[in-house]
Amino acid sequence: VYDRLKLTGQMSYVDFYKKDLGYSGTSGVFRLSQRMSPLLPVMWQIPDENGRMVDSENWSYGSVRNPLQVAYESGMEERKTRVLNGIFNADLKIIDGLNVGMQYSANIYTRQVDEFNPKMLSYYSDGSPLKANEDAKDYISQSHLDVMTQTLQFTLNFNKTIGRHELGALLGFSQEWENRSTLGATRDNVMVEDIHVISAGMINFMNSGTKDEWALRSYFGRVNYAFDGKYLFEANLRADGTS
């Protein structure tokens, strides 16, 4: 059987980790720095005992939040992604000109995102707090995604040469299916800022989760005929169905 059966396979694994600021996109440092007025100081200025203007303890702001405040105080977002890929092939020679083949592949993808943003307070240039500070809250979230995609295919190949006549035929079956699930949770008012876990949030409990799956099944076939190395006829048939 060893001279009739051929087995091959390949696997790959990726483990990816990224840590970024808690705010991104239009609320991120780079976009805010493009929109922030260059005439504003980094910190609000106040006079010292000698009448000179020096930095206060409060960040300045304009029509948008101070990008440096976001850089230093916006918290973090951690993204962990793992991907496992595998593909396996088998080919069995039944008799001369007749082979059966099988291919199976799987892709396993997982992603976890942890985000924590402490409350960032804003003050007027005279040091008085904005009224919006009263509603400011710490925010923590965690989301998880699991995806598994699989493909299975069987083929039966026939090839025969009789004199100058060449006959070929193929019958096949394939199926692809995927299972996907998500789970997420958010909380506000984190009890201890250094402990970034969902259970540390005290109010505004919000949870979400989804699960879905799909499948695609196909049957296909082909018949071809050639004479003296020239293709004269070929017919193909395929039927697909999905869930």
Question: Regions from the language model: what does each represent?
Answer:
Residues 217-227:
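Structured alpha-helical segments in the cores of large, soluble enzyme domains
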Residues 233-241:
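Transmembrane beta-strand segments that form the barrel wall of outer-membrane beta-barrel proteins
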Residues 109, 242-243:
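Short strand->helix junction
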Residues 160, 179, 211, 225-227, ...:
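Structural motif corresponding to the C-terminal cap of alpha-helices
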Residues 2-85, 101-218:
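Surface-exposed loop/interface segments of Gram-negative outer-membrane beta-barrel transport/assembly proteins
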